[in-house]
């Protein structure tokens, strides 16, 4: 039996990945595997720019709407799910197209997993309580004592990563820096071709980000977050789902901690920071082919042709 194949299409948020993936689907019998840590959550459609019903009807999508926002998803689970799906899609005589920008998941898929523990809800709740009582600076100073290497690498206001680093230390008794130094050996059971959309014109990308954020507001993003608060009373500002870009800022706005103009400004700024981090990851990622989504149609056509050649179609 031939080795399964998968074509990965990576890129920053608002960088044209979905549009190009749909163009590939017009020419090849593909099924899309989402590489997006936000799309796994149900009832979070607008703020995640989830593919529309018509787009999902046109081409099968996987790893979308698979868990409620009260649960968490991990890189380890993604590797397991993605590997299984590539095999299943190949067995149907179709091609797997991995699309997204959650680079931590992609690194786990291609380079292996760190021996890190799964998230612990009780411990995370305790850390959140400490943060509320004593402030984020208290948690950061604690991290400096138990894992100075990781603390030096993180910004003092990086609440999510500071909490995760402390969680790893308390669960294992070892600093995260020790775990990150040892990757679990990993060999992909399928052939992978990696392509990326990397815009040279950052101003154009920033413009797209702002336009998309305003479009989300017009589509009812605030109402979507209000619905989440009603439907899932267990959600807090510290829940993994609400840490998604845009949702965290909307949550603070609905809590009365910021006004509407500041919410919009911070939401756009956070999305730009996400894109910057994604591009930083991409610069460190081995790529088989690259295109600029804002240059001309010829650039993206090269990626479509690369997919055809890779799949032998």
From Swiss-Prot:
Ligand binding (substrate): 13-18
Entry binding sites for ATP: 11-18
Catalytic activity line of the entry: adenosine(37) in tRNA + dimethylallyl diphosphate = N(6)-dimethylallyladenosine(37) in tRNA + diphosphate
Keywords: ATP-binding, Magnesium, Nucleotide-binding, Transferase, tRNA processing
A Pfam family reported for this protein in Swiss-Prot or TrEMBL: IPPT
Superkingdom of this protein's organism: Bacteria
EC number: 2.5.1.75
Segments of this protein annotated with the region Interaction with substrate tRNA: 36-39, 160-164, 243-248
Protein name according to UniProt: tRNA dimethylallyltransferase
Naturally occurring in which organism (per UniProt): Neisseria meningitidis serogroup B (strain ATCC BAA-335 / MC58)
Gene name as annotated: miaA
